[in-house]
Amino acid sequence: MSASPVAFGAPKSPAARNRKRKPAPTMEAPRPRPALGKIALLVAGLGLGIVTALTVTAETSSQLSAPGGLFTFLGSLTGMIGTYLALIMVLLVSRIPVVERVAGQDGLVRLHRAVAPWPISLLAAHAVFLTLGYAAAARAGAWHEAGTLLTKYPDVLIAAVALGIMCLIGIISVRAIRLRMPRETWWLIHLWMYLALALAFPHEIVLGPSFVGHPLTQVVW
């Protein structure tokens, strides 16, 4: 009696192997969770309110009525809000899984693009308002005061470098310019935003009215 090849474990035909082969598992992006999105939006709005309140409560009526006081206040306000929004903007594209579960990667990218123009515009306004405010207080010209701020105030020069980096990132983000650049170059320059935020940090703590004399606020920020 001849032995059956199947009984002795002979190799199965390709067709038999294909019938039992299971597809390889695929990685799926985290699905958006609307409930988490609403909570995150509430937290972000609360943070914005706290930042605004810190700036407003740091000013007194006498400071506002002094020469250049209004410009200085507007400079502080735009600086604080602009920095907060810049941090939010970076967080949106940080690829942190917990963050991506809130709105999904595509939704976060759309939010990032919607938020992006605001921090750069506000921080540019911050520099202009403060220069005008300090110039009015010193009864000096704006250009002269700009030079004084850059050379005689601590950490302002590196903050100006940070603002320049942010403006460069804003320029290359314009669609007409972005499409003409190699994606690798565009992405590498975008990573400089982390450097810009780090460079801008010292002058906020040393000179910001919301931080000077407020150690708890410094630690939280």
Regions found by a protein language model. Give the residues of each.
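Membrane-embedded alpha-helical bundles that constitute the cytochrome b-like, heme-associated redox core
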Residues: S2-W221
